[in-house]
């Protein structure tokens, strides 16, 4: 099974995810974001809401990929198309390798035109956070950051990972 994994609720990412969903009509779509309007964008574009799963527990790239890890493993996916920004793809790729290992069936689908140089050092730090999670199962974050980010995402969607038992 092919999976389209959209990291975050950025409107341009949604547009790219929708294009992929139309090109791969049998693929499931996993949107890892607290932006609940994403599902509506997909359904407005004619994508069956039964194909879409919302992960509303993630608050950054590391949690995007660690929260969806179990789901994607259970779905026995043969390939995962990761939809993200071009400047974000370097970080997302590093974190994907830390979470899934080098054998990951992932393909980055970035859009945009430039790379943010500040993102490189941040990406390396997040790589080690993800690697620590992969080795120990522990996510390490400042408590105040986690609480601040989690307070933004209080609602749940019909197709959330929480309701699916993940």
Residues of each region from the PLM?
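A general structural signal for short secondary-structure boundary/capping elements
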Residues: 100, 127-134, 151-159
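The feature marks non-catalytic terminal segments
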Residues: 139-166
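A structural signal for short, hydrophobic/glycine-enriched beta-strand patches
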Residues: 1-126
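A transmembrane-helix-recognition feature enriched in membrane-embedded lipid enzymes
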Residues: 118-146
């Amino acid at each position: 099974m092919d999976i389209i994994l959209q990291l975050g609720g950025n409107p341009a990412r949604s547009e790219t995810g929708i294009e992929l969903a139309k090109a791969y009509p049998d693929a499931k779509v996993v949107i890892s974001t607290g932006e609940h309007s994403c599902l509506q964008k997909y359904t407005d574009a004619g994508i069956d809401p039964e194909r879409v799963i919302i992960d509303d527990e993630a608050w950054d790239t590391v949690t995007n990929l660690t929260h969806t890890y179990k789901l994607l493993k259970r779905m026995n996916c043969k390939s995962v198309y990761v939809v993200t920004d071009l400047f974000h793809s370097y970080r997302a790729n590093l974190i994907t390798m830390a979470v899934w290992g080098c054998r990951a069936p992932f393909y980055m689908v970035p859009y945009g035109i430039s790379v943010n140089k500040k993102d490189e050092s941040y990406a390396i730090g997040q790589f080690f956070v993800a690697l620590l999670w992969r080795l120990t199962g522990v996510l390490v974050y400042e408590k105040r950051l986690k609480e601040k980010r989690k307070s933004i995402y209080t609602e749940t969607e019909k197709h959330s990972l929480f309701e699916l038992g993940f």
